[in-house]
Every structure is written in C-alpha cells, then in structure tokens.
Amino acid sequence: WSSDVCSSDLNGNTETKYCEVGDQVRVVAAQAPEGKKFSHWTVNEKPICYNESYTFTVYKDIAVTSVYVEEAEEIQKEVSVLCDVSYANGRVKFLSKYSVPTDADYKVIKAGVVATDSTGYAAIQEVQQELTLDTTATTRLKKYGVNTDLYLANFTQYLKTSRTTTWYARGYVTYQDNSGEQHTVYSDMAQYTIR
C-alpha cells in the first residue's frame, strides 16, 4: 500500500511525498513571511498540531497544510479529533488521531473510538441520537479507549470480522479543563463498507 502526503506552505507551494502506509513522516513549517506567524497544521482542513514541526503516521492519502496568521492575531487553539475506518485481512481498523493544546492547562484523561455497524447506526438515526459514548439507542455499540496523558497521539483498535456491513465510527478525547470540568470532543463520522 502506498499513500500520498501533500503539504503546502503560505506561498501556495505544495510538496507531495509518496509513502508507504505505516511510515512516519515529519513536516516542518516554512519560515513565515514578514508580518505573519505560524499558527498550526491542518490535516484534511482540521487543525491537528500547533507546533512548527509535526510528525505523524501515514494511514491513507492526506493533505497536511501549514497555516499562518497575521503577527498581531491571537492564535485560538482548540481540541481536535480525526477518525478513519479501513478494512484489510479480515479486520476493521479504527484509527483516531487527537490533539489537545499543551498550554491550555488541560489534563488529558482518555482517548479512543466509539463504533457501530449499519444495524446499530440505523437504530441511532431512528431516534435522532448521535454516535457517542452515551448513545442508548443500540446495544451494538463498540466502545474502545485507553486512559492516557498524551496531548498528541493516535489510538488504533482492530475488530476481526468479515460480515458484509458498514462500520461507523467517531474518535474521541476526554480532557479536564482548569476548573476541573470534564469534556469529550468527538471527530466527524467516519465509515467503511465491507463488501
């Protein structure tokens, strides 16, 4: 399996690297032009890292973009989560990538993936719920997670199956803010159909 990784800088220059799935890639932001400063990296247009260098594991074709803002602009850092579902060799792979700002006085508690098959997802939609850890509309929920204190990491879970269905998943990260309140942030929905 090979994959394309595209990174671009402020001047519109795009660099494409061809990598193997599973390779680790490091991107470093170009020097900001006068009057600008580096803000963050996005993966497929979602903020994922606020450091000028970002190392990640390639899991599919992705676009990694450096974002620059005006020098005087305050950078608004946010918690972000991405999710991907794939299938190979009789196993569904759920992958969640998350990033929690290190300077926001947050404490990371747990990260993982919540998933269900097409039967479970239909039940969730029927009662107009969302796929979350608190979903009550189906017993077909798969909740995977690990207690962690990492601010930028991947979480991967495999499920052995060959049944024809569509798997739906959302990555999540749970953190505690500086007032002691816990929050869980979810990715957009990812899905993969086994045929």
Regions found by a protein language model. Name each.
Residues 15, 52-56, 62, 148-157:
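Short strand-edge motifs at loop-to-beta-strand transitions and within beta-strands
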Residues 70-195:
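Short, surface-exposed linear motifs at loops/turns and structural transition points
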Residues 1-7:
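Short, small-residue-biased leader/transition segments that mark boundaries at the very start
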Residues 25-30, 61-69, 169-173:
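Append "Rare intracellular matches occur via the same short Y/T/C beta-strand/loop motifs
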Residues 3, 51-72:
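Conserved "repeat-terminator" motif of extracellular CCP/Sushi domains
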Residues 23-52, 164-166:
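Surface-exposed interfaces of beta-sheet-rich extracellular modules
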Residues 8-37, 58-60:
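Extracellular modular ligand-binding repeats in secreted and cell-surface proteins
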Residues 20, 49, 57-59, 87, ...:
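Surface-exposed coil/turn segments at beta-strand junctions on protein surfaces, enriched
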